[in-house]
């Protein structure tokens, strides 16, 4: 039993604001240059073809195309943007 009733409760009740991390564009989705694909802390996903990396490890598209996630032989996950060739009819 607590000796004083509210001793602990006044020290609780704080939490940090969520950072909205995670995948923003999933595999197969269309992107244009500049679109954010993944927000992350550290390099959980590494940049592949046509993908840039920001100073906070955000991955973003460098060209228009389709997002692709793949795991290479070194067991790292890579995010690439595959350019889509548009056919004119």
Swiss-Prot record:
Q: Which GO terms describe its biological process?
A: translation
* Annotated keywords: Ribonucleoprotein, Ribosomal protein
GO cellular component entries: cytosolic large ribosomal subunit
Source organism superkingdom: Bacteria
One Pfam family it belongs to: Ribosomal_L27
What GO molecular functions are on record for this protein? structural constituent of ribosome
Q: Which Gene3D superfamilies match?
A: 2.40.50.100
Provide the leader sequence positions: none
Query: Per the record, which residues fall in region Disordered?
Result: 1-22
Q: Which InterPro entries match?
A: Ribosomal_bL27, Ribosomal_bL27_CS
NCBIfam families referenced in this protein's UniProt entry, alphabetically: L27
Q: Report the sequence similarity comment from the record.
A: Belongs to the bacterial ribosomal protein bL27 family.
How is this protein named in the record? Large ribosomal subunit protein bL27
């Amino acid at each position: 039993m607590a000796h004083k009733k509210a001793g602990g409760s006044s020290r609780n009740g704080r939490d940090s604001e969520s950072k909205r991390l995670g995948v923003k564009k999933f595999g197969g989705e269309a992107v244009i240059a500049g679109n954010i694909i993944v927000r992350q802390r550290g390099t959980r996903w590494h940049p592949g073809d046509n993908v840039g990396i920001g100073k906070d490890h955000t991955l973003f598209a460098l060209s228009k195309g389709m997002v692709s996630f793949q795991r290479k032989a070194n067991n790292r996950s890579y995010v690439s943007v595959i350019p889509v060739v548009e056919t004119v009819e």
